Amino acid sequence: MNMEIMLDFNDLNISTYELCRILGILLDNAIEAAKMCEEKIINIQVRRDFKIDRKLIIIENTYKNKSLNIDKIFEKGYSTKKNNEELHGLGLWNIRRILHKNSNLNLFTTKKDKLFSQQLEIY
């Protein structure tokens, strides 16, 4: 795991609880996905973008399910996990609810050949 933090957390315009909830879900998902891969990679960047005055938290991980539909992962009940499905499919949906309550937050999800990426922007 690689981690880089270059940000003062005192000026974030989000409650500590909501930020921890988002990060906990994203990190749990990244760890679960990377565990399933032969090459287990998790990259975390925390930094400030001074050009447009935003904070960025980027979490990237290797993933196995290349057919993953990133348009559906935020739907309530959608899960890539096959066991105990009633316990899964709520994490990213909860993030979506937090994003809707906070107009200063954006989350961009992308996938490439090797890495799945979640970029949280805080304005």
What do these predicted ranges mean?
Residues 41-53:
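Short beta-strand/loop element within the Bergerat-fold HATPase_c
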Residues 102-112:
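Glycine-rich ATP-binding loops of the HATPase_c
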Residues 53-86:
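Glycine-rich/acidic phosphate-handling loop/turn and adjacent ATP-lid/helix
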Residues 3-22:
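Conserved short strand/loop->alpha-helix "switch" segment adjacent to the catalytic nucleotide/phosphoryl-transfer site
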